[in-house]
A protein has these predicted regions:
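Short Pro/Gly-enriched coil loops immediately N-terminal to beta-strands
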Residues: 15, 84-97, 111-113, 186-194
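Flexible hinge/capping segments at coil-to-helix
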Residues: 99-117, 132
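Extracytoplasmic small-molecule ligand-binding "clamshell" domains
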Residues: 6-82, 144, 223, 232, ...
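Ligand-binding cleft/hinge of the Venus flytrap
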Residues: 38-47, 87-89, 111-113, 122-145, ...
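Short loop->beta-strand "edge-of-pocket" segments that line small-molecule binding or catalytic clefts
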Residues: 9-23, 109-125, 218
């Protein structure tokens, strides 16, 4: 965290491309739901948000060390080195996608024993990552940029049997890659879980920033701004 000469505080935030939540505005002219919310909250409190796309595993490591001011966006589970606000950005659902000709359907963790599953390095999938790894027949974790797009193409090419990711994000990239006619959703894992901005515990201002998010979200929901941003991205999620 640093300041301009005008004393505006600069927040350095990182995350991976995860549209419609975090989008590349140079490609689609929109920043994404979470980036819009984050900027609205902090810009109104004399902060300047500097956001950069990074592979998620790298973002986590940099966040844990306090090399950046925040990570966007994260589940709380398994993230003990971060401080989180109390009100979630959104409730998230993790879903499986397979090729349309595939008969497999997720029923419980035991059903994973039949598939080769594509995941993204560093993701915890709503806190279910240990049970997933303990039950799946085989797992391929992909790192680097555009991980979900790479996994969906691996599924298309039958290199893996299924892909697991956030429901709205899967919908976005399946449409983007024109894969709607060849893929289908086949079950959700666990319950809906909140997504949050994570602030490193090693940084002294993290609790203050988390409190700022809670106050900002409360204000945005009361004024209708939050709902307006949801609608902008075609989301009508209950929160």
């Amino acid at each position: 965290m640093n300041t301009y000469a005008s004393e505006k505080v600069v927040l350095h935030i990182e995350g991976d491309e995860w549209c419609p939540y975090m989008c590349d505005e140079n490609a689609i002219k929109q920043k994404g739901l979470f980036r819009d919310i984050t900027e609205s909250i902090f810009n109104s409190q004399n902060y300047e948000v500097k956001f950069e796309f990074m592979p998620w595993a790298r973002t986590l490591k940099r966040g844990e060390k306090g090399e950046i001011d925040a990570i966007l966006a994260a589940f709380k589970e398994g993230r003990e080195k971060f401080i989180f606000h109390k009100i979630e950005l959104i409730q998230s659902l993790q879903s499986f996608v397979v090729l349309k000709e595939t008969n497999w359907k997720f029923k419980n963790f035991n059903s994973l024993k039949d598939i080769h599953l594509g995941l993204i390095l560093g993701y915890i999938y709503g806190g279910n990552i240990d049970q997933i790894k303990n039950n799946a027949k085989k797992i391929s974790e992909i790192g680097g940029e555009n991980g979900l797009e790479k996994n969906l193409m691996k599924l298309k090419n039958k290199e893996i049997d299924a892909v697991l990711d956030e429901n709205h994000v899967l919908q976005y990239y399946i449409k983007k890659l024109d894969l709607s006619t060849s893929m289908k959703f086949t079950g959700n894992i666990g319950k809906r879980a909140g997504l949050y901005i994570g602030f490193p515990k090693v940084l002294p201002n993290s609790q203050k920033l988390a409190d700022t998010v809670d106050k900002g979200l409360t204000k945005m929901k009361k004024s209708g701004e939050y709902q307006k941003i949801l609608k902008k991205y075609g989301l009508t999620v209950k929160n």
